[in-house]
Design a protein with these regions (language model features):
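Interdomain motor-coupling "hinge/lid" segment immediately C-terminal to the ATP-binding subdomain
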Residues: 3-107
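Short catalytic/ligand-binding loop motif for oxyanion handling, primarily in non-cytosolic enzymes
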Residues: 2-3, 168
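Accessory nucleic acid-recognition modules appended to NTPase machines
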Residues: 59-216
Length: 216
């Protein structure tokens, strides 16, 4: 709502900039990460960056991820969500967000998500759009030579920050990432997100897609 009010009142007189959690490129070229860089994390210590994520508060200010991220989630749900959309059952919405974290890197199945959360498919669709509008998640469409089929086929869901996804999944340490069922999906999320950041930081549209053959 605030975004809409600003763009309507200052149309033609503003420039919008998307600020996302740090990319690997930023970690390498800045002094924000005094303890470690992306080169230090990958490939041997990538579980650590999967778990901590790259929000500035965690990376630049050294606030422990397991302290800051749960507070960020609570603030987002209790304050920001109320301002953006009139959601009456915040507990149910919280469950839905956690469910999305368990599906990062997977194809979106609105019917299944709605059934598991006890909501309608239309509500699930609206909540996905809300998470997307507030830069919690983004969607990646499947690649197909026929453009119309790209619009029809279901996209994949990715979190902008793997640390946020880990916090929602209840992962308490980098060591737990190593044996967690979502480890592969979190790694895929980290790569997909960094590709998207590469485009956004250069003022380009991130027209990325995923490939899936007949064998899945």
């Amino acid at each position: 709502l605030l975004h809409e009010a600003i763009t309507q009142s200052l149309a033609g007189r503003i420039a919008l900039t998307t600020l996302l959690p740090f990319s690997f490129e930023e970690l390498r070229t800045s002094n924000h990460s005094s303890k470690a860089t992306a080169h230090d994390y990958l490939p041997m210590q990538y579980e650590h960056i999967l778990w901590s994520g790259t929000y500035p508060r965690v990376i630049a200010h050294g606030v422990p991820a397991n302290e800051w991220l749960p507070n960020y989630i609570a603030t987002y749900i209790e304050r920001d969500v109320r301002q953006i959309q009139a959601i009456t059952d915040l507990a149910q919405f919280t469950l839905f967000v956690r469910m999305c974290a368990g599906r990062t890197g997977q194809i979106i199945n609105l019917s299944a998500m709605a059934n598991e959360c006890g909501i309608s498919p239309n509500t699930a669709k609206a909540w996905i759009s809300l998470l997307e509008a507030s830069y919690i998640i983004f969607k990646v469409p499947p690649y197909h030579q026929n453009f119309n089929k790209r619009l029809i086929k279901a996209p994949k869901l990715y979190f902008y920050d793997t640390g946020l996804a880990c916090s929602l999944l209840g992962i308490q340490s980098p060591e737990q990432v190593q044996s967690h069922f979502a480890r592969g999906a979190l790694f895929e999320t980290m790569i997909a997100t960094d590709i998207k950041k590469w485009f956004i930081h250069r003022g380009k549209q991130a027209n990325i897609s995923f490939w899936r053959d007949s064998n899945g």
